[in-house]
Amino acid sequence: MADQTKKRYVTSEDLKKHNKPGDLWISIQGKVYDVSDWVKSHPGGEAAILNLAGQDVTDAFIAYHPGTAWHHLEKLHNGYHVRDHHVSDVSRDYRRLAAEFSKRGLFDKKGHVTLYTLTCVGVMLAAVLYGVLACTSIWAHLISAVLLGLLWIQSAYVGHDSGHYTVTSTKPCNKLIQLLSGNCLTGISIAWWKWTHNAHHIACNSLDHDPDLQHIPIFAVSTKFFNSMTSRFYGRKLTFDPLARFLISYQHWTFYPVMCVGRINLFIQTFLLLFSKRHVPDRALNIAGILVFWTWFPLLVSFLPNWQERFIFVFVSFAVTAIQHVQFCLNHFAADVYTGPPNGNDWFEKQTAGTLDISCRSFMDWFFGGLQFQLEHHLFPRLPRCHLRTVSPVVKELCKKHNLPYRSLSWWEANVWTIRTLKNAAIQARDATNPVLKNLLWEAVNTHG
């Protein structure tokens, strides 16, 4: 009883006032935590917390943190509790499900997917080296380019997995795998991926908070981008100018060609982040890993006999990775979108609304890297991909219970939905009555502040 009298209370409205850098509070299970100073040390990045600032973040916290993380909360507790703390039926069921998965050990039983994938990556790399260095046939070189593209896809899946949970027994080894599979093998910084990907997960399909939807002037999934909205992630305006209008007017035609060279933009984004003034965890290690890639890859290409074959080799290897770039878009482009920050109180609902699953046979799971179960992954990002197919029926049943969407489309259907979404926006972009701003070519590479 004495402890009860010492409690101090705030309302949810009071909590919302502490939602900016320097004055940043969050609540978890009714207890309030002041993370104003600590937010810069957050392993998942500042953006993830800033997106949910001044709110209850219990569901997101459960989704992204292991049980050991709860022990670190008490030192951030400022003594306040939320007086009108309320848990919805959806959240209550979600938390029960997460607890059940934890009790069954699903978050800890990682299987051997990473080992198998890295073994395949090693075999493909050996085949690529042999094809380029020991063969003179152009067909051998083309096959090597295809294998290199597939290698990059599978390596990216390992980087993705290791970024969400520890795929090995130790954190240092996990970090090494991140750098090898991301920076060294693919040339894409794991630091950049974590920065954008964590924000994407938290603010799934928010037009102004989710960086994975912000592709002006190349693509726009919603006509709301035509108002030149401000990206809360990049901290700059996404200008809808004459260049954007022209490109977006034909985006349903240019989608697949752009995906074939989309890797170039990821290289640019990596360099822009690593050499920016932003705080980048392990910046030196990330730069070192990128230097490894830009040493072996150009060197490998240089062993090809002429510039024509070199160009074809690079283009084919990049084009193969378009399969993965397209998949990322299929999971979200045709799903529901919204503007504004995510709401911690309907976190589960926002994840179901903003994602699409891709249906496939179990023998194709390796090809999609588990991301065909996009909703399951978004709800339980720490869940090893070997369990996603197992939990899928349970998630589907929970969505059905609460009348929430659970959309699982074939690869063909998902492409049709995506192209339809792009076409609808393209037709609207051609409307001359929509005002545009002055052209800024530099917007084409999503520059960072």
UniProtKB/Swiss-Prot annotation:
Query: What keywords does the record list, in alphabetical order?
Result: Electron transport, Endoplasmic reticulum, Heme, Iron, Lipid metabolism, Membrane, Metal-binding, Oxidoreductase, Sphingolipid metabolism, Transmembrane, Transmembrane helix, Transport
Query: When the coding gene is removed by deletion, what phenotypic consequences does the entry describe?
Result: No visible phenotype under normal growth conditions, but mutant plants show enhanced sensitivity to prolonged low-temperature exposure.
Listed GO biological process terms? cellular response to cold; sphingolipid biosynthetic process
Q: Which SUPFAM superfamilies does the UniProt entry name for this protein? A: Cytochrome b5-like heme/steroid binding domain
UniProt cofactor(s): Fe cation
Ranges spanned by the short sequence motif Histidine box-2, renumbered to the chain? 197-201
The protein's superkingdom reads Eukaryota
Give the stretches traversing the membrane.
113-133, 138-158, 176-196, 255-275, 284-304, 311-331
Signal peptide from the UniProt entry: none
Q: Which Pfam families does the record associate with it?
A: Cyt-b5 (PF00173), FA_desaturase (PF00487)
Q: In which tissues is it expressed?
A: Highly expressed in flowers and siliques. Expressed at low levels in roots, leaves and stems.
**Cytochrome b5 heme-binding domain spans which residues?**
7-91
Provide the primary localization.
endoplasmic reticulum
What's a single GO CC term here? Answer: endoplasmic reticulum membrane
Q: What is its EC number?
A: 1.14.19.29
Which InterPro entries does the annotation name? Cyt_B5-like_heme/steroid-bd (IPR001199), Cyt_B5-like_heme/steroid_sf (IPR036400), FA_desaturase_dom (IPR005804), Fatty_acid_desaturase (IPR012171)
GO MF = metal ion binding; sphingolipid 8-(E/Z)-desaturase activity
Purpose: Plays a major role as delta(8)-fatty-acid desaturase which introduces a double bond at the 8-position in the long-chain base (LCB) of ceramides with or without a hydroxy group at the 4-position. The enzyme produces both the 8E and 8Z isomers (in a 4:1 ratio). This structural modification contributes to the quantitative partitioning of ceramides between the two major sphingolipid classes, glucosylceramides and glycosylinositolphosphoryl ceramides.
User: Which family does the record assign?
Assistant: Belongs to the fatty acid desaturase type 1 family.
Q: What is this protein called?
A: Delta(8)-fatty-acid desaturase 2
